[in-house]
Amino acid sequence: MMHLRNITAGNPKTKEQYQLTKQFNIKWLYTEDGKNWYEEQKNFQYDTLKMAYDHNGVIICIEKDVSAINPEGASVVELPDITANRRADISGKWMFKDGVVVKRTYTEEEQRQQAENEKQSLLQLVRDKTQLWDSQLRLGIISAENKQKLTEWMLFAQKVESTDTSSLPVTFPEQPE
């Protein structure tokens, strides 16, 4: 099975490559050990999965046809077309680690960023939910029921805002009904 690591753009290495670059604006891609991406494609088997992954091991492309992959800035590995490998996708939740496809493990910094994103999403949800009630309150035309809902959502917003996303794990308060 093929495994081409750290593929980057480089200059043409032969006169023929130079002419092709000049004529068709071809970008030449090479592995960290100097192999030409285009020449190596013929060495991949037709009945396997080809996965491109970034420098963190996160899977960014999955194809059966290796020529459909743009591997610039990534590595490409060939894997058997079996259920364990087919379950992966390019959502960012899968990685190639130690020779196998696994669920992604997030760094603490990534987990903190995810928590901060969730916090901002929840605060936007509060703004969306309460916008009409807030206008009704300002105009003095809010019903008692909606005033109660507005209060519950604003208390929820206060709890969300005070949630510390710098220490893991982060637990957010329950949303009002």
From Swiss-Prot:
User: What are the UniProt keywords, alphabetically?
Assistant: Host cytoplasm, Host-virus interaction, Late protein, Viral attachment to host cell, Viral receptor tropism switching, Viral release from host cell, Viral tail assembly, Viral tail fiber assembly, Virion, Virus entry into host cell
Q: What is this protein's expression induced by?
A: Expressed alternatively with tail fiber assembly protein U'. The switch from S-U to S'-U' is performed through inversion of a DNA segment called C by the phage invertase protein Cin.
Which segments of the protein form a coiled coil according to its record? none
Q: Does the keyword Nucleotide-binding apply?
A: no
Which InterPro entries does the UniProt record give? Answer: Phage_T4_Gp38_tail_assem
> According to its UniProt record, where is this protein located?
Virion; Host cytoplasm
Q: Which GO terms describe its cellular component?
A: host cell cytoplasm; virion component
Q: What is this protein called?
A: Tail fiber assembly protein U'
Q: What does this protein do?
A: Chaperone involved in tail fiber assembly. Expressed alternatively with tail fiber assembly protein U'. Remains associated to the tail fiber and participates in the host receptor binding. Two alternate tail fiber assembly proteins U and U' are encoded extending the host range of the virus.
User: Its family?
Assistant: Belongs to the tfa family.
Which Gene Ontology terms describe the biological processes this protein takes part in? symbiont entry into host cell; viral tropism switching; virion attachment to host cell; virus tail fiber assembly
Carries keyword Repressor?
no
Q: Which cysteines are joined by disulfide bonds?
A: none
Taxonomy, top ranks, is: Viruses, Duplodnaviria, Heunggongvirae, Uroviricota, Caudoviricetes
